[in-house]
Regions:
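N-terminal amphipathic alpha-helix/helix-capping segment at the start of soluble metabolic enzymes
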Residues: 1-79, 84, 117-126, 274
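Alpha/beta enzyme core
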Residues: 23-30, 63, 76-109, 114-287, ...
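Hydrophobic alpha-helical scaffolding
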Residues: 43, 265, 295-296, 328
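PDZ domains - specifically the beta-sandwich core and the conserved carboxylate-binding loop
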Residues: 289-291
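Histidine/acidic-residue-rich catalytic or RNA/ligand-binding cores of hydrolases
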Residues: 297-303, 327-336
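A short, acidic, flexible beta-alpha connecting loop/helix-capping segment that sits on the rim
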Residues: 321-327
Length: 350
């Protein structure tokens, strides 16, 4: 098992010993082996959705814990294949993307329709597939930062996927169209029995103010999570909160001083706890992003993110670039270290 405290270094006490005095843990719907029976059973989802959610929970090293470790590799579209895979050309072959997820003991592999369809007959029965339905691509010039549908829910269903995912750029000029598209797609996915995952991202230049990037503020991302749950996301993928006070900084929208005085603090665990509260207190699971590859600090950064997510009450981590931009052996090692956080009973809910 990974020595978590050693990796956290000087931050170990503030992260591992923190007690949340903002939103109590007993008000949350926390992950666990019985999450489907305890939480999802209340929803209007068809039985097949519950079955597929349980399939996700039963797979990989975290099987039976209620936590999720997902490998996402859609960057070939989002960031260009060359930029994504030049460090490891073997990942130009979709087979190796899926093999990385299997070798690392992930609950699920998430990728584009093309990647997963090209190997679906070989792998769909070996590891759960999550098909990403829409993407932003950077070949169009000038870049517009919009999300375009690349595949249908039926295409994902027919290849044997248990889940579909999509991104909405909340706050962007195109967000209302995206909300309509993805709300309809999630409705169709649920009818076919698939789990729905929303990348609930913010996108607006106005969210950068005085040198601070409020795309990762707890209050604004929290509202994005609330909108994600509103359109039927079973799981919400969100960037980990790094600051707060986005509403006040941009001087737009609605907030309340108690969000900052009572419901959050400066501790990152409390900021993520607020993100989770906006996921209907955990009725929709919260998974945080692993972030960009950063070199020598990747292992420490990934474990730190996992500790914050777990202690806040989150459901897991969706980590891609930090893993597939390394050798497969090193990628497996990094993902396993993240999983060790969720397997370690000493890392408790704050």
């Amino acid at each position: 098992m990974t020595d978590i405290a050693q990796l956290l270094g000087k931050d170990a006490d503030s992260l591992l010993q923190h007690r949340c005095m903002t939103i109590p843990a007993d008000q949350l719907y926390l992950p666990g082996h019985d999450y489907v029976d305890r939480v999802m059973v209340d929803k209007n989802r068809p039985p097949a959705v519950l079955r597929n959610m349980q399939t996700l929970y039963n797979t990989g090293r975290l099987g039976g814990t209620g936590y999720l470790s997902i490998l996402p590799v859609d960057q070939g579209v989002e960031h260009s294949a060359g930029a994504s895979f030049a460090a490891n050309p073997l990942y130009f072959d979709p087979k190796n993307i899926v093999e990385l997820a299997i070798e690392a003991g992930c609950n699920c592999v998430a990728s584009t329709y093309g990647v997963l369809a090209s190997v679906s007959r070989r792998y769909a029965h070996r590891i759960p597939f999550l098909v990403k339905l829409n993407h932003n691509e950077t070949l169009s010039y000038p870049t517009e930062y919009d999300q375009t549908l690349y595949a249908s829910v039926e295409q994902a269903f027919n290849m044997g996927a248990v889940a579909v995912g999509a991104t909405i750029y909340f706050g962007s000029e195109q967000s209302r169209r995206q909300i309509e598209e993805i709300s309809a797609a999630f409705e169709r996915a649920h009818k076919l029995g698939m789990v729905t995952v929303l990348w609930a991202y913010l996108r607006n230049n106005a969210f950068k103010k005085d040198g601070v990037d409020y795309h990762v503020s707890a209050d604004l991302t929290g509202q994005a999570n609330h909108l994600a749950a509103t359109i039927g996301a079973d799981i919400v993928k969100q960037k980990m909160a790094e600051n707060n006070g986005g509403y006040k900084a941009v001087n737009f929208g609605y907030t309340d001083d108690r969000v900052y005085s009572k419901l959050t603090s400066d501790n990152p665990i409390d900021l993520v706890r607020y993100q989770l509260a906006n996921c209907y207190m955990g009725r929709a699971g919260l998974i945080n992003s692993g972030g960009a590859a950063g070199g020598e600090t990747d292992l420490t950064d990934a474990v730190r993110t996992a500790v914050i997510n777990k202690r806040a009450g989150g459901m897991g981590l969706i980590l891609g670039r930090k893993a597939f931009k390394k050798s497969m052996a090193d990628g497996v090692k990094l993902i396993n270290a993240v999983q060790d956080v969720y397997l370690d009973n000493k890392v408790t809910i704050a």
